Protein backbone atom coordinates (compact mmCIF):
# COMPACT_ATOMS: atom_id res chain seq x y z
CA UNK A 1 0.00 0.00 0.00
CA UNK A 2 2.81 2.43 0.88
CA UNK A 3 4.47 1.68 -2.47
CA UNK A 4 1.23 2.48 -4.30
CA UNK A 5 0.91 5.77 -2.41
CA UNK A 6 4.50 6.72 -3.17
CA UNK A 7 4.01 5.94 -6.85
CA UNK A 8 0.78 7.97 -6.89
CA UNK A 9 2.46 11.01 -5.31
CA UNK A 10 5.46 10.69 -7.63
CA UNK A 11 3.17 10.76 -10.66
CA UNK A 12 1.29 13.75 -9.25
CA UNK A 13 4.61 15.53 -8.67
CA UNK A 14 5.71 14.89 -12.27
CA UNK A 15 2.41 16.24 -13.60
CA UNK A 16 2.61 19.27 -11.30
CA UNK A 17 6.21 19.99 -12.25
CA UNK A 18 5.09 21.55 -15.55
CA UNK A 19 3.18 24.32 -13.73
CA UNK A 20 5.05 27.60 -13.26
CA UNK A 21 5.72 28.99 -9.79
CA UNK A 22 7.26 32.25 -8.59
CA UNK A 23 11.08 31.90 -8.45
CA UNK A 24 12.39 31.84 -4.89
CA UNK A 25 8.94 31.25 -3.38
CA UNK A 26 8.03 28.44 -1.03
CA UNK A 27 5.12 26.54 -2.58
CA UNK A 28 2.77 23.82 -1.36
CA UNK A 29 3.63 20.51 -3.05
CA UNK A 30 1.06 18.71 -5.21
CA UNK A 31 0.19 16.38 -2.31
CA UNK A 32 -1.05 19.36 -0.30
CA UNK A 33 1.07 18.78 2.81
CA UNK A 34 4.72 19.01 1.75
CA UNK A 35 6.51 22.22 0.76
CA UNK A 36 8.75 22.91 -2.27
CA UNK A 37 11.07 25.71 -3.28
CA UNK A 38 10.58 27.31 -6.67
CA UNK A 39 13.65 27.44 -8.92
CA UNK A 40 14.70 30.45 -11.01
CA UNK A 41 13.17 28.81 -14.12
CA UNK A 42 9.70 28.67 -12.49
CA UNK A 43 9.79 24.90 -11.88
CA UNK A 44 9.53 23.17 -8.51
CA UNK A 45 12.83 22.35 -6.86
CA UNK A 46 13.49 20.48 -3.62
CA UNK A 47 10.50 19.42 -1.56
CA UNK A 48 10.01 18.07 1.92
CA UNK A 49 9.05 14.41 1.89
CA UNK A 50 6.58 13.58 4.63
CA UNK A 51 5.74 10.25 3.01
CA UNK A 52 2.25 9.84 4.40
CA UNK A 53 0.06 12.93 4.31
CA UNK A 54 -3.12 12.64 6.33
CA UNK A 55 -6.28 12.77 4.25
CA UNK A 56 -8.57 15.74 4.73
CA UNK A 57 -12.00 15.09 6.18
CA UNK A 58 -15.00 17.03 4.90
CA UNK A 59 -18.45 17.23 6.44
CA UNK A 60 -21.14 16.84 3.80
CA UNK A 61 -23.85 14.50 2.71
CA UNK A 62 -22.84 11.91 0.12
CA UNK A 63 -23.66 8.38 -0.97
CA UNK A 64 -22.05 5.99 1.57
CA UNK A 65 -18.91 4.25 0.31
CA UNK A 66 -18.98 6.00 -3.09
CA UNK A 67 -15.88 7.69 -4.54
CA UNK A 68 -16.22 11.19 -6.00
CA UNK A 69 -14.12 14.17 -7.13
CA UNK A 70 -13.72 17.40 -5.18
CA UNK A 71 -12.03 19.75 -7.63
CA UNK A 72 -8.86 17.81 -8.60
CA UNK A 73 -8.90 15.64 -5.46
CA UNK A 74 -10.25 12.12 -5.11
CA UNK A 75 -12.64 11.50 -2.22
CA UNK A 76 -14.52 8.59 -0.75
CA UNK A 77 -17.73 8.96 1.21
CA UNK A 78 -17.86 7.51 4.72
CA UNK A 79 -20.12 4.58 5.52
CA UNK A 80 -22.58 6.88 7.31
CA UNK A 81 -22.71 9.32 4.35
CA UNK A 82 -21.90 12.36 6.51
CA UNK A 83 -18.16 12.85 5.92
CA UNK A 84 -15.59 12.09 3.25
CA UNK A 85 -11.84 11.52 3.13
CA UNK A 86 -10.06 13.28 0.27
CA UNK A 87 -6.55 13.49 -1.14
CA UNK A 88 -4.71 16.73 -0.48
CA UNK A 89 -3.49 17.69 -3.96
CA UNK A 90 -2.96 21.35 -4.75
CA UNK A 91 -5.41 22.11 -7.55
CA UNK A 92 -4.07 24.60 -10.05
CA UNK A 93 -6.43 25.78 -12.73
CA UNK A 94 -4.97 26.89 -16.03
CA UNK A 95 -6.02 30.33 -17.21
CA UNK A 96 -8.06 30.31 -20.45
UniProtKB/Swiss-Prot annotation:
Cleaved signal peptide residues: 1-20
GO terms for MF: serine-type endopeptidase inhibitor activity
Region (Pro-Pro-Arg motif necessary for proteolytic processing): 54-56
Intrachain S-S bonds: 21-38, 33-53, 36-47, 62-77, 72-91, 75-86
Top-rank taxon: Eukaryota
Residues forming coiled coils: none
Residues with site note (Reactive bond): 88-89
Cellular component per GO, a single term: extracellular region
The keyword Lipid metabolism is annotated on this UniProt entry: no
A Pfam family the protein falls into: Pacifastin_I
Tissues in which the UniProt entry reports expression: Expressed by the venom gland.
InterPro entries: Pacifastin_dom, Pacifastin_dom_sf
Subcellular location per the Swiss-Prot or TrEMBL entry: Secreted
Keyword annotations from UniProtKB, A to Z: Disulfide bond, Protease inhibitor, Repeat, Secreted, Serine protease inhibitor, Signal
Function (record text): Inhibits trypsin activity and prophenoloxidase (PPO) activation, an enzyme essential for both clotting and insect innate immune responses. It does not inhibit activity of chymotrypsin and protease K, and has no effect on phenoloxidase (PO) activity.
Protein name: U-reduvitoxin-Pr12a
Species for this entry: Platymeris rhadamanthus (Red spot assassin bug)
Amino acid sequence: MKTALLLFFALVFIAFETEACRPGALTVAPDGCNMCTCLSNGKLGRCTHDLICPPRMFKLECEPGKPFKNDCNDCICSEDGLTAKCTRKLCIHKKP
